[in-house]
């Protein structure tokens, strides 16, 4: 049985991993819109890696009979208007 603090921290990490994936996907969309397909692809790969991390934590928690709580994913607050941003 997992300690309640460990459960909470792991659940928080699941949500952080999904937020990171969301952020990388936002970067990918930005670079794609600028015609920089290589950068867009790199950020897509990073987004997938973050989703994979989240799912590993989910699986671990589920295997330990812990119900995962998925929070809303916040909109990334990173201004990206130019390549210099």
Set out the residue ranges of the language-model regions.
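Iron-associated oxidoreductase/ferritin-like identity signal
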Residues: 1-85
